[in-house]
Amino acid sequence: MQKKSLLIIGAVWVEPNSSAAGKRMLQLITQFLERGYKITFAAASQKNEKAIDLISLGIDAVAIELNNASFDVFVKELQPTIVLFDRFMMEEQFGWRVAENCPEAIRILDTEDLHCLRKTRAFCLKKQVPFSVDELLKQDITKREIAAILRCDFSLIISTFEMELLKNTFKITDTILMYLPFLFDEITVKQEKKMQSFEERMHFIFIGNFFHKPNIDAVLTLKNEIWHLIRRQLPKVEIHIYGAYMQQQIQELHNKKEGFIVKGFAEDANKVVESAKVVLAPLNFGAGIKGKLTEAMLCGTPSVTTSIGVEGMADNFPWNGFITNDFSEFALKASELYTNKLIWKKCQLNGIAIINSLYSKEKNALLFFNKIEEIQRNLENHRTANFLGSLLQHQTLQATKYMSKWIEEKNK
């Protein structure tokens, strides 16, 4: 057995230029590589041209199949010391196989964001009813995701809001939860001075992965509710819409006369964000930390967003711009930020303070690996204390296991 080896079971192959989730996964991979781990990345999805070359990083890339005993042979031979599940669906599919074949491996769930929270909010928005915890508790996806969290040795939670929700609403002990936001190098004064100035920047920007429904909704909100109000105050300004997997529905919004410019995939997201003056993100639903907003801070670009956008991202620090759920006020604040250099600069510095205080790679990664070492030293006691997790491992996964075996036989 490798002294330090990690198996990552990915929902998709790693695409850091397409999504915040891809960036997050690459951040985690980098931390394990820096600590001398031998890494194997396995996924059952199709690889495309946007996926990075893992082999060039010294990582073994392995294609696996759902509901197939070949995974048992593979994982038993590999015997990793840690298994990281990329989102709860991967734990549902492969968790029981890992538990059976590698009982000593620490099982970590990277939630990315709480899918149950995002899906329930989308459901409530569609039904035009207010989001409530009661509605969250009714959803099947909530039961599935919470069960996966309980079955793992610990789970990575990306926002402070989600940490509080899991502890207070679902009564999950923080011994099996770990707050781990995005991991960034701190921004130095020298780097801040090199950022493009207020005068050098032009236009508004929105950037996001359009596989992600909150991003589609946000761009439609910009087009239908907000942009005409901004143009009334700033008739020559443009908004540039960037993102991976852009559907025709979004492409058709392009209107040069109105200054609503749909650009498509950005090869270098940093470059386009740091040359824009303001990021607009009118998010009506979603969960977790918003990559577009941390990217804005890293690029020194202030933003206007909603309470959903900022949720769990800034603790008690003043925001990197403005927060409002009212479309008229959103347009006013966007125009103010675009035209007022003093306010713009103050908001830029707020963003730098948030990155350096809350998203420090050095500080957060140290806590993460301390947690791993602590559990490795006391794995048996840690699992004994998580009785509900043991119960679910025993009961729920028996059903999952035999359903999977039935599908396996059926596929032969």
Please place each PLM-identified region on the residue numbering.
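Acidic donor-binding loop of glycosyltransferase active sites
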Residues: P80-T81, E274-G288, T301
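Short hydrophobic beta-strand element within catalytic cores of glycosyltransferases
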Residues: K292-E295, P302-T306
